[in-house]
């Protein structure tokens, strides 16, 4: 008797279901995607007991003809592709023909469908059709799934708690709603409505319905394109962040995908505007020719392979960076407080006005780019779019300008570099600090007026209009840590450490952030030992390391020797710096000298910035504000913390009860 035999179709379906149907959320995803492919405009999802007891998906799509209804339950039966060439131009969400038979093999499934005439009802249990009959039904399809995994109870023990499984279902529906704002979605669990969208095509209104109105108001529209890709959507301002990447939705030709490199590019677009360990909210819609993407990678179709991915990541990073550069990134104090308050979602969120950047998301123009139809003219897009400073000890009080020449308001440490080239630039920096306090450049110091006496009138600090930075008038210092200033639109509180850190960072980034060929010969070479696997990997990247000044020569089977290093390496830390860059290569397979030097600039800017409890005189404080106003990004320190916060006039009036509370009766209100 032969040992190799063909599996029964029902058993084969159950095996395939292990990849397609992992949990109740997988069932919801597959059924809703089928409804979208059927051109539905209204999709209603009802689940009971987190989907384990019952899942119902109702749509108003094209429906299934009676003659095709049984075929829909067969493996690899689909209407979405016909031949091999279609695999390279997939425009639908589904195409493998596995979803319905996989679901039916592990559940009790009822299909009710109609194309507009007499409907059809099919009852399938465990992959076997039990009944096929005519039924009264409106145009569209209803799929009822009961007793999921009832015939494979071993699968149940791998599921999480009902709350976790329900959260996964909600997440899937929310992602699909963000992908298709022209489709009205509703999700109901045990009689309680969890999600509802209007299907009006306004992406920002969908964001408001999912994440809340306050979050939607802090998101801005982005748009960018190149010959192969078109990017649009919404990203949050740096003040609105979350603790994980899960609030980043990447949509590729209408399909929600997971792609670490694209998420990384989006985050890189924020630069130093994000705090460490914080991530933005974003909905990024990417349109491209289907020829440039392979979605036939995994049965869930959430992992894809993208051709020319490097060009796409660059486009995303540049688009986000340019858009955020146009925004005023000063957080409002009361907005920060309000976002921490519990927010009760109501259906009013779906229709209320958000702000001027709210725009209709024209899905009629959201076409998949074809090889012969690349973007050339118009592009469908959304239109119009205090940290607690750690005390480092009480420093000696600063002397006044009348006693001695103004000293730089920096922490004077020992020389950080030992090489002559860097000593020259470091000396130049210190001279500029003496001539222009708190990092003022020689160019700006040359055009400034003579030093202001302590008794002179306080002049407004002129800001750069392009940065939308306010014109600040210095008022005083609070606890040797914060500078108080006023502007025409209210009161500003400036973190002096973060402010000088930003000023120093931009100086160092320009001074040492450019690649140089200067190298320092070592009297005693550095020997580095690595495992054989790392040595073999490093041999593939010797040219890359050499391009940034790290020349590794073989020194035995498991060692390298280094005879020289770039002059900008910090004295005493040459070995650690080289090892860090080598580890970077081993981890990522590539290295960016510009990014590494930027990290160095961030480190030095923090070390040389004034700390908390460091009292400044009026001249030094005004000099710091003046320099901050000319910074490229005056709103955040290099680590992403805010440099200043804003109290509007209305905020101040609320604090002193000069504005009537809308919930307070006005009969006994006294107007000041």
UniProtKB/Swiss-Prot annotation:
Extract the SMART domains matched here: DNA_mis_repair, MutL_C
User: Which key words tag this protein in UniProt?
Assistant: DNA damage, DNA repair
Q: What does the record give under GO molecular function?
A: ATP binding; ATP hydrolysis activity; ATP-dependent DNA damage sensor activity; mismatched DNA binding
Q: Name one GO cellular component term.
A: mismatch repair complex
Fetch the InterPro entries from UniProt.
DNA_mismatch_repair_CS, DNA_mismatch_repair_MutL, DNA_mismatch_S5_2-like, HATPase_C_sf, MutL/Mlh/PMS, MutL/Mlh/Pms-like, MutL_C, MutL_C_dimsub
Where do the segments described as Disordered lie? 371-403
Example of a GO biological process term: mismatch repair
* Family label: Belongs to the DNA mismatch repair MutL/HexB family.
Q: Which NCBIfam families match?
A: mutl, PRK00095.1-3
What does this gene product do?
This protein is involved in the repair of mismatches in DNA. It is required for dam-dependent methyl-directed DNA mismatch repair. May act as a 'molecular matchmaker', a protein that promotes the formation of a stable complex between two or more DNA-binding proteins in an ATP-dependent manner without itself being part of a final effector complex.
Protein name as catalogued: DNA mismatch repair protein MutL
Its taxonomic path starts at:
Bacteria, Bacillati, Bacillota, Bacilli, Lactobacillales
Question: Gene encoding this polypeptide?
Answer: mutL
């Amino acid at each position: 008797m032969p040992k190799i035999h063909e599996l029964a179709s029902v058993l084969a379906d159950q095996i395939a279901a292990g990849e397609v149907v992992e949990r109740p959320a997988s069932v919801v995803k597959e059924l809703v995607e089928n409804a979208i492919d059927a051109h539905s405009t209204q999709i209603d999802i009802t689940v009971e007991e987190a989907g384990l007891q019952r899942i119902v998906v109702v749509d108003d799509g094209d429906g299934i003809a009676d003659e095709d209804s049984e075929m829909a339950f067969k493996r690899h039966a689909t209407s979405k592709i016909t031949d091999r060439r279609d695999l390279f131009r997939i425009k639908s969400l589904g195409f493998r023909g596995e979803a319905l038979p996989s679901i039916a093999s592990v559940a009790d499934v009822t299909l009710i469908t109609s194309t507009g005439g007499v409907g059809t009802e099919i009852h399938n249990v465990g992959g076997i059709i039990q009944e096929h009959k005519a039924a009264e039904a409106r145009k569209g399809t209803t799929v009822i799934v009961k007793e999921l995994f009832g015939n494979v109870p071993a699968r149940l023990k791998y599921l999480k708690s009902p709350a976790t499984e329900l959260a996964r279902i909600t997440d899937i529906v929310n992602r699909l709603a963000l992908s298709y704002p022209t489709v009205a979605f509703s999700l109901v669990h045990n009689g309680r409505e969890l999600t509802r969208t209007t299907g009006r095509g306004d992406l920002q209104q969908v964001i408001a319905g999912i994440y809340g109105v306050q979050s939607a108001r802090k998101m801005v529209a982005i748009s960018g394109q190149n010959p192969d890709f078109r990017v649009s959507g919404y990203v949050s301002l740096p003040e609105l962040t979350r603790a994980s990447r899960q609030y980043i939705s990447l949509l590729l030709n209408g399909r929600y995908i997971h792609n670490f490199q694209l998420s990384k590019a989006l985050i890189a677009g924020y630069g130093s505007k994000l705090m460490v360990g914080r991530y933005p909210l974003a909905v990024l819609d990417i349109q491209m020719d289907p020829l440039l993407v392979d979605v036939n990678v995994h049965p869930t179709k959430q992992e894809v392979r993208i051709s020319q991915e490097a060009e796409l990541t660059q486009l995303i990073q540049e688009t986000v960076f340019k858009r955020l550069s146009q925004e005023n990134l000063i957080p409002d104090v009361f907005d920060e407080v309000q976002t921490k308050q519990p927010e009760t979602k109501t259906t009013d969120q779906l229709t209320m006005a958000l702000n001027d950047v709210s725009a209709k998301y024209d899905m009629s123009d959201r076409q998949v780019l074809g090889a012969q139809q690349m973007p050339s003219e118009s592009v469908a897009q959304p239109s119009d779019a205090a940290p607690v400073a750690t005390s480092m000890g009480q420093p000696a009080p600063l002397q006044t300008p009348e006693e001695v020449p103004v000293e730089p308001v920096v922490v004077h440490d020992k020389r950080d570099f030992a090489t002559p080239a860097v000593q020259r630039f470091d000396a130049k920096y210190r001279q500029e600090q003496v001539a222009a306090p708190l990092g003022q450049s020689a160019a700006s110091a040359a055009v400034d007026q003579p030093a202001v006496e302590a008794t002179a009138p306080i002049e407004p600090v002129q800001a750069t209009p392009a940065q939308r930075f306010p014109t600040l008038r210095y008022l005083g210092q609070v606890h040797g840590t914060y500078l108080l200033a006023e502007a025409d639109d209210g009161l500003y509180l400036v973190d002096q450490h973060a402010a000088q850190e930003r000023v120093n960072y931009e100086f160092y980034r320009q001074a040492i952030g450019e690649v140089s060929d200067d190298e320092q010969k070592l009297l005693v070479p550095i020997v580095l030992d690595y495992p054989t696997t790392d040595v073999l990997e490093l041999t593939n990247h010797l040219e890359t390391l050499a391009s940034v000044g790290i020349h590794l020569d073989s020194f035995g089977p498991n060692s390298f020797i280094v005879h020289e290093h770039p002059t900008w390496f910090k004295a005493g830390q040459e070995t650690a710096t080289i090892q860090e860059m080598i580890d970077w290569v081993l981890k990522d397979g590539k290295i960016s000298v510009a990014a590494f030097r930027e990290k160095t600039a961030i480190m030095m800017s923090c070390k040389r910035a004034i700390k908390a409890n460091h009292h400044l005189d009026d001249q030094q404080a005004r000099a710091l504000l003046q320099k901050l106003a000319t910074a490229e990004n005056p709103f955040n320190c290099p680590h992403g913390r805010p440099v200043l916060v804003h109290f509007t006039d209305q905020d101040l009036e609320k604090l002193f009860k000069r504005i009537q509370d809308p919930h307070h009766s006005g009969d006994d209100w006294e107007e000041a």
